[in-house]
């Protein structure tokens, strides 16, 4: 699992969303969300922005992790 996928899964679960529920918010398939979380594929920049909006986080939380962003430790 890549960093974005791991962070995506963590943030999705924190919001108590299923993959299906997140997929509906983004108008994509559940399989797309699963592929991002497992690292089989990576969301493009536009999708990263939509994910951040759907999860109500800064896009950097998806890239660097919510803990790093909360501590101000991102580059």
Predicted regions span which residues?
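Short, charged recognition helix plus adjacent turn
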Residues: 63-75
